[in-house]
Amino acid sequence: MRREALWDRLYLSGIDGRAAELARENGLGLEIAAFCYAPNLEDPAVLSAVRSDMAGLDRFWFHAPFAELAPCAIDPLVRQVTEKRYRQAADLAQDLGVRRLVIHGGFVPQVYFPEWYVEQSVLFWRELLAELPPDMTIA
């Protein structure tokens, strides 16, 4: 495959503070990673910085928070927090005009039996995905 064929599918992770600048210089997409840390979803300063990073770019992935979030949690309260944070991420991505989200499934083999995980995943994701815009991609 030629280099040009891949170029429009390459994204730099915003974890690196220079990612937006490098993406602009090289015609790459940007993965917005500032919201991997859930409290940043509610921080106006972080949102402002992300908007600045997005300037001059046109291809994005939005990385939702994941630490301590578990869609298949045994504890219903943990599941509620997870749902809240994922909804916040999807809403914020939409507000930013981003239609592609990275959301971790939360499988921890030392904690969940695979059967439980699959069963609970279907319940969790069916409800959440039904509320997202049809043009939004979750990976």
Residue ranges of model-derived segments:
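N-terminal pre-domain/capping segments
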Residues: 1-88, 94
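Active-site acidic/histidine proton-transfer and metal-coordination neighborhood
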Residues: 73-139
